[in-house]
């Protein structure tokens, strides 16, 4: 394969070269328009939007408008924000418009780049979604780029987690909507639970640009979005099962599989559990739940670790995002795992929940007509992006070549030796005033390192889930001379670390609103770092207040500039990785925090043979290295075998995780096809005021099923007319059937069908006439939606249980996925048939009277109570009560949140 790739590269050039060849001519075309666009006054420039839209209405494509639109955005950005798009940013924008992933290094201006494709696609009038990883970035990016869009007459909306229905509707009605992946996904699910089409908030899924696309479409791909309702199960069973875990022995009663993040009971363990719980057969049908709880309790004790996977704060178990180190407050593991951890930590145990609606990010984002993404690290996952999302990765060259020096890894035998070497390097770096960002993979490790630094008298900041409130401040100061910052993984991602520390004077400039021409010139000279001219302008200001403010800004700039030059002289920001992550991409993200926009920088990883990656995924040959004799303590291991083993281990884990994500998608595709059918049916009801043709079709199908069941064939003497009559009486059809009458017919069964159908149709029409057409139409729709939601909820519950138990068919050498598809299809077929029967039964049995009033529409949209993301649940907000067809009330619940590669496997139990 490598030889073929090499031949293709020689003949056609590398993919990178081929991509550039396509982009460069378009960039030249854009640049050729720059002078003519510059010559436009503000009024003419802002009217470009109207002209573009008119051309689109006349049939012109977005592709043909692209050069002019991009040149327009570039000029507007320069006039409103003082930022001109570089040519490489133009390339990134073209790639985004083409429905690709633009890989742009940290500091290359991805947010500004996105404005090009966002503006162009907003002209189509179908709405553009810009997807970010958290609420803060959604709001920041929208407000930051808003001057460009405002100038061009393009509206901007922002979705935030705490918004109500009306606020969301307004945000989605805008030309451009910023929000998180979770909010977009949950709004889609909620839209498919509303009782009236006007209650929907989202429009079409036309075009989405996903920022940090690797984080959302790869890291969180195993995180199903789930809207759930409370279950009636008691919580005392968790306490009961939790007590038996300390009595079980690892190796004898159970085995821990760290690679798969799983625990398996041995035969001896099964017997031991049966003995402790005083039961005869743990795997008897009545003990299915018990097996599940024992399994989850074992995982809680043996796989999930406090201060690594979660923290306990104020009597609650709070999940830690594996990829960012951030706390995921309000979110919960699903399938009883969170309750098992609560029992382990001896805190209040919350009730389990039942799924009401769900979708994976994979299937949600594949609904968009066009999808694009941005990140600094996508190329290592190019195969997955192509196979799952049909997205090509286009690597955009940096505007200024990267000056960062990446040094080889230093590997030690033990973790203790590694940390000692790290301490020595940090001390050396701080002595020469070089700022250092220390990346760790867990809170536990960050706190161990923090204690060592404190003992050595080294001042430092820690950024992890326990101190996340100070994140912005800590990240802002991480570039100061001699600053030492410990951060778990990619905490602070999305915010650049500026060499010299935070440029506080910029905030002061932005908030200084003054139309005085001298003040304007002063602000411009500060941004251009022309401090001498700025000082002369300060002297010309016409008031002491203005001069005082200008003086404060100048002082702030001078302090930052001195710090900036000191850091540059020291070598820029140094990245010190304390452990390799399972994915090379995460390591690259950490390295990418240094060397932005041509700044100097450096990076090095310190590893030990006791690190999780080496211990769990390294080959047996590596473990032999730990027995090396005659090596003095603290000496680093320099071996190609170690370096190659690290690379192989990472590739092995990446492949393993890709297989899991692909496996999840294969299972979710079964549910997705069913979800599409249900939501299509639901939308048909919402979009049509009169659904009587749909109901009439259900009535005919129900009648046909009854006749096929009770009156098979054309021999009336063999028919079970008594059962048919019993069914018809239940619907109050008043059906009169004479066997003799049908014996005279050429096709007795068809004649019977026609008679029963016409009787049912007359009964149906008389009910509608009696109550009044308008009331009847609304009543029908309400009945249909309530029964549909109820049946769908029950079907999801059944599919959950099918998924949990389907692994057992593997023992009989059958493929669990094939079996899941077959059984899932049969169950769905039955659910649809039951749905139709129940709707028909309810329609005929519903009591109506002449003075019936029109049912009140549910006007209010409330943020629903419980959300689950990626196997996580979230409790927040109020309740949305929906009456069910059986008269009971269900409290619907909803979601938001992110997830991690391993924590999200909510289905994969065994």
Curated annotation (Swiss-Prot):
It comes from Leptospira interrogans serogroup Icterohaemorrhagiae serovar copenhageni (strain Fiocruz L1-130). One of its GO terms (cellular component) is cytosol. It comes from the Bacteria. Residues 876-886 have a biased composition (Polar residues). It catalyses: ATP + H2O + cellular proteinSide 1 = ADP + phosphate + cellular proteinSide 2. Part of the Sec protein translocase complex. Interacts with the SecYEG preprotein conducting channel. Has a central role in coupling the hydrolysis of ATP to the transfer of proteins into and across the cell membrane, serving as an ATP-driven molecular motor driving the stepwise translocation of polypeptide chains across the membrane. Keywords: ATP-binding, Cell inner membrane, Cell membrane, Cytoplasm, Membrane, Nucleotide-binding, Protein transport, Translocase, Translocation, Transport. GO terms for biological process: intracellular protein transmembrane transport; protein import; protein targeting; protein transport by the Sec complex. The gene is secA. Monomer and homodimer. Part of the essential Sec protein translocation apparatus which comprises SecA, SecYEG and auxiliary proteins SecDF. Other proteins may also be involved. Pfam families: P-loop_SecA (PF21090), SecA_DEAD (PF07517), SecA_PP_bind (PF01043), SecA_SW (PF07516). Its EC number is 7.4.2.8. This is Protein translocase subunit SecA. It is a peripheral membrane protein. Its main location: membrane. ATP binds at residues 89, 107-111, 496. The keyword Cell inner membrane applies. HAMAP family: SecA. SUPFAM superfamilies: Helical scaffold and wing domains of SecA (SSF81886), P-loop containing nucleoside triphosphate hydrolases (SSF52540), Pre-protein crosslinking domain of SecA (SSF81767). Belongs to the SecA family.
